[in-house]
Amino acid sequence: MKLNLLGESPLPPPDAHRIARPEDADGDYYLHWRDERYHLCDRQNRHPPLTLDFADYLGRSGSETLPKTLRGLADAPIADATAGWGKDAWLLASRGFTLTLYERNPYLHTLLAAALAAAQENPRTAAIAARLTLNHADAAAALAPASFAAVYLDPMYPERRKSAKVKKHMQALQQLIGHSGDDGALLARARLAATRRVIVKRPQHAPPLADTAPHYHIDGPNTRYDIYLAPNTPDKN
């Protein structure tokens, strides 16, 4: 995917396609550098420009169910293989976990990299940001065997119908990434990489990822976390 860039950013992404005006963009999206940050813009105006600032996540409680899925792994290496907007990774880092993030989409990776760099310079967020490492890679190909204690997956789930309740950031994520169709390969790679467990975030109504039954699941208010245990793990159902 070609990344369209409008404006003179200090550290432009490699191989960015520079454009002079929005209509020059190759595709529906472009990044606009202004006011010292990137804005994700939609040429079809389906949503306003979106930015990412990890400081906005400070003070938000977030899900308390997700950290429970990583119980006993406070000091272990964890991978977030589908980083997206980084909200879940930030929540876990704020609870003391250390994570390596993987994001293959160039737009989301650029937004994440800029936001993480800014968070590292902000005294309010630096300690949390220090627990996050970002990779621009497809986790289905990049995850090495037995490289993490746990791998977290939040793959895009195709919406059954459009809803006004879907947040703008999620709308953009759906339009940018869509449903990749390689869920089976991603889950298989994650299970090879995890020495303890794989956690898959799913809507309550959704079937298991790639129709592969988990060992057990943990329910949140609107979300289900399916847990796949690694062979010979000390973890129990």
Question: How would you describe each model-predicted region?
Answer:
Residues 1-78, 94, 102-150, 237:
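S-adenosyl-L-methionine
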Residues 27, 75, 148-151, 195:
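Local beta-strand N-terminus motif with an aromatic residue
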Residues 62, 68-109:
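Hydrophobic alpha-helical segments and helix pairs
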Residues 78-89, 148-164:
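Conserved proline-anchored active-site loop of SAM-dependent methyltransferases
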Residues 138-142, 178-191:
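A short, acidic, amphipathic alpha-helical segment used as a generic capping/interface helix at domain edges
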Residues 155-186:
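Mobile active-site "lid"/loop adjacent to the S-adenosyl-L-methionine
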Residues 183-229:
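Conserved Class I SAM-dependent methyltransferase catalytic core
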